[in-house]
């Protein structure tokens, strides 16, 4: 499976410009099977503003993902804030034919106040695509190894989409290797870049093999 990891900055309060920027980054990328975007890739990780959430029935960002998947004939995944009987940090996996599955983030980042506005998910989600089984995970889930336990070899790749700050990036790097090694699975991890107030994000997106070795990656 060929995967494009898209590490990008987010234009404050402009979903349209942010999505256009992603399209520009992908313009020079040849055909791949899967495009992976960061956590809340269209709006940024905003745990105080409920207005960033779109209807679960079908908002503009999910429709954009479906259009991108169809145009590129690739699956597209990343997380979006949605309103579904309460706000959810929803990690979508969208197929080229427009069908999709999703995972709602289970471990909300309480230290940042995510739990005040968002409701946690319950069940993990494994998607099989082109013969590869992918476990959908979101940011803070990385710190909870039991939640990604590869019992009976139920998945081949764990995909983490994140907004992980620079101040804790050494933990990100180490935990990605740990999750790969302990589960004997590949890890695909995509983090954003940029600055929001006092928070800096410097990427470190990467693909890690089941021995904990970095196959490919981006620094910042």
Predicted regions and their residues:
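Hydrophobic residues at beta-strand termini and immediately following loops
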Residues: 6, 103, 127, 190, ...
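CN hydrolase (nitrilase-like) catalytic-core segments centered on the catalytic cysteine
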Residues: 60-74, 143-220
């Amino acid at each position: 499976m060929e995967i494009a990891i898209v590490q990008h900055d987010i234009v404050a309060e402009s979903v349209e410009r942010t999505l256009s920027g992603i399209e520009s980054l992908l313009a020079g990328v040849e055909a791949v099977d899967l495009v992976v975007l960061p956590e809340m890739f269209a709006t940024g990780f905003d745990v105080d503003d409920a207005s960033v959430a779109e209807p679960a029935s079908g908002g503009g960002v999910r429709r954009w993902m479906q259009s991108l998947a169809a145009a590129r004939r690739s699956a597209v995944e990343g997380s979006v804030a949605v309103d579904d009987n309460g706000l959810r940090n929803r990690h979508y996996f969208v197929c080229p034919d427009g069908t999709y599955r999703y995972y709602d983030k289970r471990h909300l980042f309480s230290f940042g106040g995510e739990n005040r506005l968002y409701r946690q998910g319950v069940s993990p989600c494994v998607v099989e695509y082109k013969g590869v089984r992918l476990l959908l995970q979101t940011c803070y889930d990385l710190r909870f190894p039991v939640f990604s336990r590869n019992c009976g070899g139920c998945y081949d790749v764990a995909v983490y989409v994140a907004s992980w700050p620079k101040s804790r990036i050494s933990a990100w790097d180490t935990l990605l290797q740990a999750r790969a090694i302990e589960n004997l699975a590949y890890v695909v991890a995509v983090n954003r870049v940029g600055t929001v107030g006092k928070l800096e994000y410097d990427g470190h997106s990467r693909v890690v093999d089941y021995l904990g070795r970095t196959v490919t990656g981006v620094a910042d």
